[in-house]
Swiss-Prot record:
Keywords per UniProt: Cytoplasm, Transport
Family: Belongs to the GET4 family.
Subunit structure: Component of the bag6/bat3 complex.
One of the GO BP terms on file: protein insertion into ER membrane
Pfam family, one: GET4
Name of the protein in question: Golgi to ER traffic protein 4 homolog
Gene Ontology cellular-component terms listed: BAT3 complex; cytosol
Keyword Transport among record annotations: yes
Provenance organism: Xenopus tropicalis
Length: 325
């Protein structure tokens, strides 16, 4: 009986708190609608720190999120970006469990920010760090997917491709690459767009996405005749490579790389990626040097990070340094 009454009182208290937040929101919204942007912004900040000091983290986060959306709708980029950062601060300090809804909210804020603003760069960096939640150093794959789709819509294909690499959306990546190749690439390089993506997915030990991106891209690209086999030797190499990865036989991998050297010489990075793939899938011992150097080192260190130990699903479980652009 006492427990039931306590629970009922708690529910009433929660309802009162929510009602109070809604009343405050109404006043702030009216202030923004009147054009009192500076005053409204300062009030949002004051309420944020007041709620946080009272451990009302959810109320603080929800108020900042709705406020950011309101400022974005009035083209107040600076105020909106500031409140977006406070949303992140509430998540970081409250140690909130990562959920798809929260990731969608963060992606929504990202999509509304000025693509050229420094605040956007800072926001996405912190958002990815928070979303990793200790389960991976690259950020949550779902957040990467949301970011990739937003950047794709903005026709920022280069950055979109990076985030697709760290998502599990091989199909989305392929569709973006088809558009990227068709609108920005040379017809003679249609095979190189997907070859690079497949090799980089494999360097991340993500066999599933590597296979999906290859199949989807080759089926949907208007300049690629249906295969296999394909007209382009490089596509045949990638097709055979994906089969070899499943089999895990070093002799097959070695012969394959030797036979297709003319195609692999089209990009100096291909053989570097294949060295890494040989280590991951075919038991090839790593080179003598303890770390990669030169151009490969820069690329691989940006793709895989510094090599902390992480238990991540298909795509990110090995910890040798590789970070790709």
């Amino acid at each position: 009986m006492a427990a039931a009454m306590a629970e009922q009182d708690g529910s009433k208290g929660s309802a009162r708190n929510r009602g109070g937040v809604q009343r405050v929101e109404g006043k702030l919204r009216a202030s923004v609608e009147k054009g009192d942007y500076y005053e409204a912004h300062q009030m949002y900040r004051t309420l944020f720190f007041r709620y946080m000091s009272q451990s009302k983290h959810i109320e603080a986060r929800e108020l900042m999120y709705s406020g950011a959306l309101l400022f974005f709708s009035h083209s107040q980029q600076n105020s909106a970006a500031d409140l977006s950062m406070l949303v992140l601060e509430s998540l970081e300090k409250h140690e909130v469990k990562v959920t798809e809804e929260l990731l969608e909210n963060l992606a929504k804020l990202f999509s509304l920010m000025d693509p050229n603003s420094p605040e956007r760069v800072a926001f996405v960096s912190r958002a990815l760090k928070w979303s990793s939640g200790g389960s991976g150093k690259f950020g949550h794959p779902k957040l990467h997917q949301f970011l990739a789709i937003t950047l794709w819509k903005e026709q920022n294909y280069y950055e979109s491709r990076y985030h697709f690499l760290h998502s599990s959306d091989g199909e989305g990546c392929a569709n973006m690459l088809v558009e990227y190749s068709s609108t920005r690439g040379y017809r003679s390089e249609v095979d190189m767009f997907v070859a690079q993506a497949v090799l980089q997915f494999l360097c991340l030990k993500n066999k599933t996405s590597a296979s999906v991106v290859f199949t989807t891209y080759t089926q949907k690209h208007p300049s690629i005749e249906r295969g296999p086999p394909f007209v382009q030797p490089l596509l045949n190499f990638i097709w055979f490579l994906l089969l070899a990865v499943e089999g895990g036989k070093l002799t097959v991998f070695t012969v394959l790389c030797e036979q297709y050297q003319p195609s692999l010489k089209r990009d100096p990075m291909y053989n570097e990626y294949l060295d890494r793939i040989g280590q991951l899938f075919f038991g090839v011992p790593p080179k003598q040097s303890s770390s990669y150097g030169g151009l490969l080192g820069n690329l691989l260190n940006s793709l895989m990070g510094s090599g902390e130990d992480d238990d991540v699903e298909d795509g990110q479980e090995d910890s040798s340094p590789i970070e790709l652009d």
